[in-house]
Regions:
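Shared catalytic-loop signature of beta/alpha-barrel
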Residues: 13-30, 36-116
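Non-cysteine beta-strand/loop elements that form the S-adenosyl-L-methionine
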Residues: 10
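Alpha/beta enzyme core
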Residues: 1-7
Length: 116
């Protein structure tokens, strides 16, 4: 139902699988696990299979690489998050500080670690 706000996050394991599926979906697709580096982000953008991203700072290789993909998303007006898989206060601060540098209309959220 198109009226329900919904995003498919990483609906398949590979970009090739997502490319096959993307044209049949009416909701946006965000990539997460398949974007492990800057080249993967560029590939996803060039294939037109990403409507946004769920970025993990440590998966991308740190803050410098994360700022590069942030800038790529700014050029293409793609939304994204500034997250991580887990961590403590330092990674939470990094995610929040980096998120503060993203244009608000493209910011999908920042991750702050909490103990379970």
């Amino acid at each position: 139902c198109q009226a329900i706000p919904f995003v498919f996050e990483q609906p398949c394991n590979t970009m090739d699988e997502i490319a096959t599926l993307k044209g049949r979906l009416t909701h946006p697709v965000y990539l997460d696990e398949s974007t492990e580096d800057q080249n993967a982000v560029l590939r996803a953008i060039s294939l037109g299979i990403a409507d946004g991203f769920g970025f993990k700072v440590t998966r991308l290789g740190g803050l410098t690489r994360m700022t590069t993909v942030r800038d790529l998303c700014a050029i293409r007006s793609l939304p994204h998050s500034c997250d991580d898989a887990w961590g403590g206060d330092v990674i939470a601060a990094a995610c929040v500080h980096l998120a503060a540098t993203v244009e608000p209309r493209r910011m999908e959220g920042a991750w702050i670690a909490q103990e379970y």
